[in-house]
């Protein structure tokens, strides 16, 4: 029988121990890391050039490693050993840690190892999505949190989303669901700042535990420690569902960045259950010093005075409001002091009303052209009837011209007719003052009416128009000081003026249509004229025509308030 030594000789080299996988350890990379930590990126590039090795780190990776590197303080091992509860182990290569792992004191779902959790199912979400919901990843995470009943376990690199945290806090406070949160050590300060801004103190939450987590640690011969970061992201709910992917709980990932998320359920969740318990055992609590520093910084930011925006240049609307405020505080001041400035401000506001006025004038002019067409009537009455129609039309046109030729101030002041009538009944001194300013506008309107009408009948209608314009100008002179009163807004005045004009034009239009219908019906009975039955029929029509002409001549006097 062969002994053990002979059996070992027969075994080929490396047969008992498996060969190490290639590229698992590289001494050249370790030396390059030493050069990077001690001398910076230039020293590392020089080393790689001397060794004729390609670069294995990008510029962002170099900066990240230098930012995570820290000099290991003396006595670090002694401090870690003193933190242990039982330091009786003297094994050179211990298979258990001397530091006791943290306990999941808030509870955990009672799943035994290998217990069946259902058929594995996968739901895939991409963001941004092109379906009914754009932000599917965020909505899927919030739906999982709302459905939690037993436990919520979260591992995240960066957590600053207010909406998701509110859902977690609501489940913790209202439904009393245990919550475990593991965050990257370098990003936990941002999470604490968000909590304090929302008015939540995590150290006082009875159903929430927040701990720090780091990646792998790399030690160099010079005593430098490089701490890795956490890139794991998953949300475990009730031990039966888990959401994982590259989606972080931040506003930028929720609104700007593209990401994906997998929602898993069934037996595959057991792997994430075990991984979370391992990570929770490796985590560290948040120090009281860090909590106090974050709290004091947030309080200092809240106490800082808000910087007011720089003063802007005054605009047209602000100047108008200032002038109205001044006049409302002193309503007895004279109108001429502010008339020039108010003219410039009102032109822009009155542009819409002026356009409607011009369109209405065009409608009246069109009706005038339609009415001037000669109609076949009786020989002894046709000319007089046409002349009468022209008289009525010229009267309305003169009234329109008299109104449009007035200044902007007079047109705007004419909207205060109701207010003027009130003032006449209560304040007699103001009415006597306003009547002294009427001759100038009366003469201007009279000249306009005389130029637009040449016959004697048109002159009488023009005098009537000038009389009405005189009254309106009196009211405008009186209402100059009362126009700025706050109980009569400028917009309401324009609306009232537009309604009055529309009603006035509709009245004139109805009168003209009535006259056209009368003349048309008169032309449809030629047999009566040829059979010498005209006197009886013509007498009846002449009375109707006479009444229509009188009504049309007085059409200017029809106002909505009469």
Swiss-Prot record:
Residues 425-472 have a biased composition (Low complexity). It is found in: Cytoplasm; Cytoplasm, Cytoskeleton, Spindle; Cytoplasm, Cytoskeleton, Spindle pole. It comes from the Eukaryota. SUPFAM superfamilies: Phospholipase D/nuclease. GO terms for molecular function: protein kinase binding. May regulate cell proliferation, growth, migration and epithelial to mesenchymal transition. May also be important for proper chromosome congression and alignment during mitosis. PANTHER family: PROTEIN FAM83A-RELATED (PTHR16181:SF29). This is Protein FAM83D-B. It comes from Xenopus laevis.
């Amino acid at each position: 029988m062969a002994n053990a030594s002979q059996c070992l000789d027969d075994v080929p080299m490396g047969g008992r121990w498996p060969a190490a996988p290639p590229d698992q350890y590289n001494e050249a990379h370790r030396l390059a890391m030493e050069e990077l930590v001690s001398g910076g990126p230039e020293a590392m590039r020089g080393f790689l050039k001397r060794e004729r090795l390609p670069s294995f780190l990008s510029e962002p990776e170099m900066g990240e490693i230098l930012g995570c590197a820290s000099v290991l303080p003396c006595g670090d091992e002694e401090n870690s050993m003193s933190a242990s509860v039982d330091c009786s182990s003297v094994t050179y290569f211990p298979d258990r840690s001397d530091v006791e792992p943290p306990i999941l004191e808030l509870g955990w779902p009672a799943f035994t190892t290998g217990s069946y959790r259902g058929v594995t199912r996968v739901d895939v979400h991409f963001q941004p999505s092109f379906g009914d919901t754009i932000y599917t990843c965020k909505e899927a995470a919030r739906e999982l949190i709302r459905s939690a009943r037993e436990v919520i376990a979260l591992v995240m690199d960066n957590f600053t989303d207010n909406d998701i945290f509110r859902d977690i806090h609501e489940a913790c406070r209202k439904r009393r669901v245990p919550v475990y949160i593991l965050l990257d050590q370098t990003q936990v300060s941002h999470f604490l700042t968000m909590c304090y801004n929302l008015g939540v103190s995590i150290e006082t939450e009875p159903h929430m535990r927040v701990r720090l987590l780091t990646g792998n640690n790399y030690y160099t011969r010079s005593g430098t420690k490089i701490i890795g970061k956490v890139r794991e992201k998953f949300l475990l709910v009730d031990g039966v569902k888990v959401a994982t992917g590259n989606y972080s709980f931040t506003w930028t990932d929720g609104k700007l960045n593209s990401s994906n998320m997998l929602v898993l359920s069934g037996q595959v969740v057991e792997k994430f259950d075990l991984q979370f318990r391992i990570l929770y055992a490796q985590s560290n609590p948040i120090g009281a010093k860090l909590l106090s520093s974050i709290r004091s910084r947030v309080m200092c930011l809240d106490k800082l005075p808000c910087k007011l925006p720089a003063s802007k240049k005054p605009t047209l609307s602000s100047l108008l409001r200032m002038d109205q405020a001044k006049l409302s505080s002193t309503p007895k001041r004279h109108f001429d002091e502010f008339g020039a400035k108010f003219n410039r401000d009102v032109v822009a506001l009155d542009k819409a009303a002026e356009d409607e006025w011009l369109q209405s004038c065009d409608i009246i002019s069109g009706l005038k052209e339609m009415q001037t067409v000669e109609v076949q009537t009786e020989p002894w009455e046709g000319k007089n009837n046409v002349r009468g129609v022209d008289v009525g039309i010229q009267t309305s046109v003169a009234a329109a011209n008299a109104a449009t030729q007035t200044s902007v101030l007079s047109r705007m002041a004419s909207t205060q007719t109701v207010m003027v009538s009130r003032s006449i009944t209560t304040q007699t001194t103001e009415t006597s003052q306003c009547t002294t300013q009427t001759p100038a506008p009366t003469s201007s309107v009279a000249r306009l009416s005389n130029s637009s009408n040449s016959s004697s009948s048109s002159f009488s209608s023009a005098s009537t128009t000038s009389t009405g314009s005189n009254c309106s100008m009196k009211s405008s002179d009186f209402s100059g000081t009362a126009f700025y009163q706050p109980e009569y807004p400028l917009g309401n005045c324009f609306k009232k003026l537009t309604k009055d004009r529309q009603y006035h034009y509709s009245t004139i239009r109805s009168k003209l249509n009535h006259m056209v219908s009368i003349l048309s019906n008169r032309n449809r009975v030629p047999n009566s004229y040829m059979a010498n039955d005209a006197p009886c029929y013509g007498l009846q029509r002449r009375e109707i025509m006479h009444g229509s002409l009188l009504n049309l001549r007085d059409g200017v006097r029809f106002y909505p308030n009469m």
